[in-house]
């Protein structure tokens, strides 16, 4: 089975690629990423030895998807994950729309063309900005980390997902 992951070098995309290859035999993974986020190049280097083909591209451009090989399944993990994107002057609402919604049209066209199934992932955009900005954070180098005494009794954190690849030297 061939799996195509958008945003393959991001936090979620790279973790999914690694997990799929570890948990199931007979799966090949390839993905596309615009490599704009911090850590993308690091994740690209970690995916290469696993056999993941990483293609530098942007799913907002239909032409970048047209040249990709067919897949049986698509996992759409590409998004602008910033909760504050388009709010408080952190980028425009149009840019947010293009990254998180308009690009989905191109992914759907790819799925239709190749008769591929689609797993559409959500982003932190579904959470209330007021509640997210009230979470206690600690500064960790050049990143933020949720304070261990935070208010999340359930859910998944980055620390749980990054088994061998910590994002922050504090872990």
Annotate each predicted stretch with a short phrase.
Residues 1-171:
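N-terminal Rossmann-like NAD(P)+-binding domain of SDR-like oxidoreductases, especially those catalyzing
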């Amino acid at each position: 089975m061939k799996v195509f992951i958008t945003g393959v070098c991001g936090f979620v995309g790279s973790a999914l690629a690694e997990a799929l290859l570890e948990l199931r035999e007979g799966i090949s993974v390839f993905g596309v990423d615009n490599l704009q986020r911090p850590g993308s190049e690091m994740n690209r280097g970690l995916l290469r030895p696993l056999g993941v083909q990483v293609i530098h591209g942007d799913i907002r451009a239909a032409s970048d998807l047209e040249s990709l090989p067919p897949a049986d399944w698509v996992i759409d993990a590409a998004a602008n994950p910033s909760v504050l994107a388009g709010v408080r002057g952190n980028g425009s609402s149009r840019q947010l729309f293009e990254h998180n919604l308009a690009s989905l049209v191109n992914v759907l066209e790819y799925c239709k063309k190749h008769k591929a199934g689609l797993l559409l992932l959500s982003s932190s955009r579904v959470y209330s900005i007021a509640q997210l900005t009230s979470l206690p954070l600690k500064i960790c180098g050049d990143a933020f980390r949720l304070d261990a005494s935070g208010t999340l009794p359930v859910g998944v954190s980055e620390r749980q997902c990054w088994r061998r690849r910590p994002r922050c030297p504090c872990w």
